[in-house]
Amino acid sequence: MATKTLMASCQCKNVQFTVAVPTECFPLNIHLCHCSICRYTHGAPCSFHAPLPVGVEPQFIAPSSLNKLTSYQHPASTATGYFCSTCGCQIGGADGQWVITPAIFDANREDEGIWKFNAHMLPTSAPDGGLAAVFSLIDGHRMEIENLGLSPQAIAGSDSQPPDPESKELLAQCHCGGVSFTIARPSEEFVASPRSKGWISPLDKSKWLASMDLCDDCRLVTGTHVISWMFVSIDHITPRL
């Protein structure tokens, strides 16, 4: 059976591997998962995942190995996610069958017919629909919507209700809660000072400026094609860094 070999690497290159995919299996379908597990483990609006054909697994390039990765599993998920222990990039996960992160296959980024953006999974987990509300059509293909297949905990998540719009603070934390802090709205003193330029939303001075980032470094550190950043003055973060 004819195969094509794809090569992946995280940002720091401490994780490198190949996958040999039967050519008859191309294109590999990509789904964007908006469940709270994926968003909070990636620190991104969603994850980008592509299931590998049955029997196809990553072949790590020495000194990379599966044992050198950091794994994470939550009771609400049956899959184990794997991350670079140095730069933090998620390379994929496994639950009998491997699901890989297509964002880190730079060696094949110019190859045609390898990937197909196919579906949004669990967009109802994000309070506002997340990127599913923005990218309903990709490469001329209308994205399918799937809201089944995961536990109620993964669908609802810890943020099933949007934050109170009148709240003066916003809680930020990773999925396991090991990193947790609060972000205060811009103070009146900060808004009035010259140093607020470039930090405050031009539409609402009670909100920090935020943006979508498509740069290579962010993509390879998170394992997602799109990352979001909010620009916050450090003196508005508690506890102090």
Feature annotation, model-predicted:
Residues A2-Q173, G178-L241:
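A short Gly-Trp-Pro
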